[in-house]
Each structure stands twice: as C-alpha cells, then as structure tokens.
C-alpha cells in the first residue's frame, strides 16, 4: 500500500529539480561577477525581500516544518501531499484547456476523478499506479504559451521567486482556481491553507540545504535556478528548448 504514496512521478519530479539545480551551479560558475542583470532590475528590493523570507524561514517556518516532519508518520505526510496535489489538478486541468492541451486535460480530469473517489479524496495516488501521470501547469505557463514575456524577476514575501508574468499564478491558481478558497467555514479554510503551506515548505527543506552548500551567493543561485526551472516547465520538459532558453 505504501507504494501508492511514493510515486514514480514524484521521484522523477524531484530528480528534475536536482538536475536544474546542478545545471544552475554550472551556469553560475560560468557567470561574470557583474551585478547587472536585465532580468532583475529590482535587485535591491528583491534581495531585501529574500533576506526577509530567509529570516522568517529560520525563525518560524523551518522549525514548524521540522516539527511537522518529526511528529507526522511518513505515510501520513505523503498522503497530505497527495491530497493537495489532487486539488491542484483542478487548476492544472483549467490551464491545460487554456493552452489547448486537450489530451492532457482529459487525462488529468480522469486522474482527478479516480483519486478523489478510489483514492479517498486524493490521499492515495491511485491514478499514477494506473499510468495517469501528474502534469504541472499554471497560469504563468499559460500566459507564456500565449506569448507574454516573463517580465522582471520579483521575490514575493513568503512565497519566494517569481516574475511579473508568474505573479498571475498566485491570483489565478492559488486563488480563483483553488477550491479551498470557496470553503465557507473560516476555521476549516484557514486550517487547510496553513497545512498546505507547511506541507509545501517542508518538501523543499532538503533543496534549501543543497542551495546553501552549493553556492556562494544564494540569491543569485536561486534566481538562475528559477528561470531554468520555468523554462523547463513552459517547454514541457523539452531539453533542447530548455537549455537554449
């Protein structure tokens, strides 16, 4: 039963993130020491927000995440992640339709129905076991497919790296298309949103340690990794376009 929690898709996604981070290390090592970056005209402001986010992580969110992982059994933790991934599929489906990826949208719609029923509201990722892989689409990628440029790099308080174009995802995917925002009971809504954020932060703690060990300038490293990751996602994993982006 435990294999329903630790899926092939989750492993492959984590592997992609590590690959992107390693590529960013090589790109960062080849970069000049010049602070001029056309992608980041707000660097002074962004570095301030980055420092604020790091402080909040160190003082509040990392301790909470560590406690969450310490007291939560692995299968429960994975089930919680699966539950929120299942809700995220609704946003993914909407963006796939907007990008005219109707085959993927149909697959993910079937995935959502199966996981929501057989998978007990998504706690078990039954669909991946059936060959219905999870896809990752958001409104920022949709705008990119429609021809919108990335715009300047922006570090968002509490959320981290983004671009002007990708800020739309916070409004559309995390707001309008997020079913949790339509829950009428405020305590239930707040509890789910908080758990979602804690789950999100806890999943990237190991990545944060890797960044700290691999880079002299964490801010620059994360910025480069962000743009590489977004290029990879926008091109649906097309390695040629991804590297050439």
What do the PLM-derived regions correspond to, one by one?
Residues 32-34, 43, 146-245:
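A structured, mid-to-C-terminal "fold-capping" secondary-structure block
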Residues 14-21:
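Sec-dependent signal peptide recognition
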Residues 1-13:
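N-terminal secretory signal peptides that target proteins for export/translocation
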Residues 37-60, 67:
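Post-signal peptide N-terminal segment of mature Sec-exported envelope proteins
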Residues 51, 66-69, 92, 96, ...:
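Short amphipathic alpha-helical coupling elements at transmembrane boundaries
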Residues 28-29:
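C-terminal motif of bacterial Sec signal peptides marking the signal peptidase cleavage site
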Residues 86, 95-163:
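Mid-length scaffold segments of soluble, non-membrane domains
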Residues 74-100:
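A glycine-rich, hydrophobic loop/mini-helix early in the fold
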